């Protein structure tokens, strides 16, 4: 146990040292551009990126991400129609999941720009998914999510890798996209990930690397109607209209279930033995799957002892937990307000 502890301490110190060194070095990347917009977008990425990205990748890598995102917006007609908030969170951001990062944005942009340049936003999204299907097919796997270019090289990936690849491809050509995820199905032992793409002000879904003649058509349409949770992670401080299951200073988990089925607000009230509301009690919502109650969401009660989850019509197991430990500032946020 002690050995594990000290190994963890050494790893944390090494990561902290590498991160600090990389930050000092990458701080100079702002001197390599005089463009005000490039600096603004670069600052946005540095403000919200994971520390591991800061330690593992160079400033030049992130500056190229910014430049190709801007290039895509200026190249395609739909670039001018995308609101700044949507562009920053769903085009500019280079990361989709926990994949290793690579230069897929530049490669895909150069590969697809002539193929889709004269298309409408809607048709371009369909065409990008056709291109993704030409290069990648489904195969189950359990390892860490592969990078987009690695997925192309192997020509296969599980749904999480296919959707990471497809979101990256859509963003590379300036189409706002996000990976959607149901942590566990309500009807069978499994989960699934797919893609939503923003077209003219509306989010549409599609099966990653599973092209259809239209958007909002996918094999999972029927099971999604029985789902109890569909969510996505949005990097950065996001103020969209979607409900938040969880909010951290660096990212949010937003609830997308209402895009797929009829929902209801499940309100939980927590009181102590004296009948007084309990603030900051953790409320975990579990769905039975794979012989366990898998946590779909964890919320914290507000000052009135209440937590509200938007969910589907089905059965959930609810756990309540209240500890005496000091909560961190971000844990005091009430994502249900």
How would you name each of these model-derived features?
Residues 1-23:
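Bacterial Sec-dependent N-terminal signal peptides
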Residues 15, 188-190, 206, 279, ...:
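Generic domain-boundary/flexible-linker signal
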Residues 114-119, 124-130, 141-149, 154-245:
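Hydrophobic/aromatic-rich core segments of domains that either
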Residues 135-139:
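A short secondary-structure junction motif
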Residues 7, 191, 262-264:
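Residues at beta-strand starts and edge strands
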Residues 20-125, 172, 199-204, 216, ...:
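N-terminal accessory/pre-domain segments preceding catalytic cores
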């Amino acid at each position: 146990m002690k050995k594990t502890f000290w190994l963890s301490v050494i790893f944390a110190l090494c990561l902290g040292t590498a991160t600090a060194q990389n930050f000092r070095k990458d701080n100079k990347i702002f001197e390599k551009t005089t463009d005000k917009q490039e600096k603004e977008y670069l600052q946005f990425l540095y403000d919200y990126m994971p520390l591991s990205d800061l330690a593992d990748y160079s400033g030049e890598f992130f500056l190229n991400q910014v430049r190709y995102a801007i290039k895509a917006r200026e190249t395609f007609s739909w670039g001018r129609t995308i609101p700044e908030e949507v562009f920053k969170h769903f085009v500019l951001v280079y990361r989709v999941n926990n994949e290793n990062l690579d230069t897929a944005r530049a490669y895909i942009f150069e590969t697809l720009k002539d193929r889709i340049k004269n298309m409408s936003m809607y048709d371009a999204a369909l065409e990008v998914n056709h291109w993704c299907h030409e290069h990648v097919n489904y195969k189950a796997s359990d390892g860490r999510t592969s990078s987009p270019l690695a997925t192309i090289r192997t020509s296969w990936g599980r749904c999480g890798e296919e959707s990471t690849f497809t979101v990256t491809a859509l963003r590379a050509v300036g189409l706002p996209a996000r990976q959607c995820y149901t942590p566990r199905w309500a009807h069978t032992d499994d989960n699934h990930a797919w893609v939503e793409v923003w077209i003219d002000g509306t989010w549409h879904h599609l099966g990653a690397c599973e092209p259809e003649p239209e958007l909002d058509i996918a094999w999972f349409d029927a099971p999604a109607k029985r789902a109890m949770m569909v969510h996505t992670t949005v990097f950065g401080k996001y103020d969209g209209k979607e409900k938040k299951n969880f909010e951290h200073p660096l990212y949010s988990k937003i609830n997308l279930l209402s895009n797929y089925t009829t929902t209801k607000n499940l309100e939980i009230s927590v009181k102590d033995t004296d009948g007084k509301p309990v603030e900051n009690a953790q409320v975990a919502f579990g769905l039975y799957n794979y012989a366990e109650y898998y946590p779909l969401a964890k919320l914290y009660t507000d000052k009135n002892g209440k937590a509200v989850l938007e969910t589907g019509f089905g059965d959930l197991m609810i756990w309540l937990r209240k500890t005496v430990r000091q909560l961190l500032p971000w844990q005091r946020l009430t994502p249900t307000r």
